[in-house]
Regions:
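Short, low-complexity, intrinsically disordered N-terminal peptides in bacterial proteins
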Residues: 1-8, 174-178
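Divalent metal-dependent catalytic cores for phosphoryl transfer on phosphate-bearing substrates
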Residues: 6-14, 18, 28, 34-149
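Charged catalytic carboxylate motif
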Residues: 22
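Internal alpha/beta core interface subdomains
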Residues: 149, 153-159
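Charged phosphate-binding loop/patch that engages nucleotide di/tri-phosphates or the phosphate backbone
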Residues: 157-178
């Protein structure tokens, strides 16, 4: 399968690579429809292709990059990828923050982080709420902030339903958009 070019250090299987391609494709379509300038469109594309670059990495590989002994294993991949990208010379704060916080959210995100958060949830390969998610994905170019709020709500409701921990950043993100 071909798709977005990943860093040589990426640890992803074929399913994850397909997800990354769908997320990046959705971000690219939104950027074109919204007529973003070239720099912002590239930031969205890069955030999409890098957000899960370490998703299939083990905690033993990722935790030393992150340096947080208490971070849940499933959350390590975003911060680890951001650290690695920064070491490799990436300087765009909006891209680094988008990648770093894409699993839990971040209240001080610029549009790049918000777009990635939505694309990660709304990409068409996910199997839950297909009709609702497709509708929301189509609305992003005309109601970016409204759809973002709804996606944050969806993620928060899912977190509560599953009995998962609500992270400080997630609560702060909700409070910033409600």
């Amino acid at each position: 399968m071909t798709g977005p070019v990943l860093p040589d250090w990426a640890i992803v299987g074929e399913k994850r690579r397909a997800h990354i391609a769908r997320v990046t494709g959705l971000l690219d379509r939104w950027a074109a429809t919204m007529r973003l300038n070239a720099d912002e469109a590239q930031a969205w594309h890069d955030a999409g292709r890098w957000h899960d670059a370490f998703r299939d990495g083990t905690p033993e590989v990722l935790r030393p990059l992150v340096g947080d002994p208490d971070m849940l294993d499933g959350l390590l991949h975003g911060p680890a990828a951001a650290v690695r990208l920064e070491r490799d010379g990436e300087t765009r704060r909006d891209v680094l923050e988008a990648v770093r916080w894409h699993t839990v959210g971040y209240p001080r995100w610029e549009r790049t982080g918000r777009a990635l958060f939505m694309a990660d949830v709304l990409e068409p390969g996910r199997r839950f709420m297909s009709t609702d998610r497709a509708f929301l994905a189509a609305q992003v170019p005309v109601n970016f902030d409204g759809v973002f709020r709804q996606v944050v709500r969806m993620r928060l409701e899912w977190t509560l339903r599953e009995g998962n921990r609500i992270h400080t950043e997630t609560a702060e993100l909700w409070n910033s958009v409600r």
